[in-house]
Amino acid sequence: MQDISAPMFSHDDYRVLHEGAALLDRTADRGRLELRGADRRDYLHGLLTNDIAALPAGAGCYAALLTPQGRMISDMRVSELGDRLVVDLAASASEGVRQRLADFIFSEDVEVQDIGAAVAQWGLYGPAAAQLAASVLAAGTASSDALASLPLYGNVERTFRDRPAILVRSDDFGIGGFEILIDASVSGLLQQALVDAGAQRIDVATADVARIEAGRPAFGRDMDTTTIPLEAGIEDRAISLTKGCYVGQEIIIRVLHRGQGRVAKRLVGMVGFAGEGPLLAGMRLESGGREAGSLTSAVDSPRLRRPIALGYVHRDFSEPGHVLEVRHGDDPVRTVTVVTTPFIQPAGE
């Protein structure tokens, strides 16, 4: 997770993300897997951290696939469509997850297929996303209100150019919106239709600013194959404490119950001071001469007008209010303060 770099983003795109309808091409950075067969839910339920068996058609959840040692292979969003499950996850993890899922199939009626090349993915986010999606994607009498009231991870099927389009409610960047899964052959036409209706294309750097402000870890940036979910703070969203066994459960339960949830390090939010220069992913953290951790994601927040970051900090220094030293080569030492996340509360909260 070492990455000394400063992301560049568009302030105009950032405004659209918060005030209008922002369109992000996610086809390349997200992978898409499909599971079919009568046993698909029970099968996936036994592997992932969340309650897949309980998902009715039109519902979904956030989950993780772990090693037996409790380390993350990937996080993912799981959508039950009624006749199949669709999983979307970081593209870098997609093939490894597909292979691992396939390796566990014995006599179960399950087929796992990579649909990443056949199905494109667009993210549509912001307060105008539901209204705009309803105007472009046909669905009989369904209204924009019906889309706006769709619960998180819920899904509905619509059509575009006589092709099915799956809309999944999401908040990956801390801003409500939808993942739109569409036949790749009409992806370009869908993009143009959404833009013609009022959406504005944004880049991933702009979306990443909102993600960091929301305190959301991203796989490959803030989580990797060495991470235990409890270290990343995703347990409330990704882990069911009432379901049956899953791979890696023993480690998770041991930490939660015997260790009272204590892990050696935690992903926390930190704020710096304007004028001291940007915070960069990969910068080292110290406290009183002791190594304290490192930054994993960082940006200058347009709304706070201060540099902010996510990073892993030793549990001795992870409580809000701790002041840590930031060190990077021969640069002057600067300081950050540990704070609670999200850095910015979503509108209406």
Identify what each model region corresponds to.
Residues 37, 87, 124-126, 180, ...:
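Residue-level signal for inorganic ion chemistry
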Residues 1-62, 66, 71-75:
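Acidic, proline/glycine-enriched N-terminal capping motif
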Residues 22-24, 31-32, 77-217:
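Acidic, low-complexity central loop/insert segments
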Residues 179-267, 271-272:
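Anionic-ligand-binding alpha/beta catalytic cores of soluble enzymes and soluble regulatory domains
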Residues 227, 233-240, 246-249, 253-349:
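Glycine-rich, small/acidic residue-mixed loop/short-helix segments
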Residues 39-44, 94-97, 129-133, 185-192, ...:
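Short, conserved charged micro-motifs
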Residues 58-60, 145-160, 215, 220, ...:
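Glycine-centered loop/turn motifs
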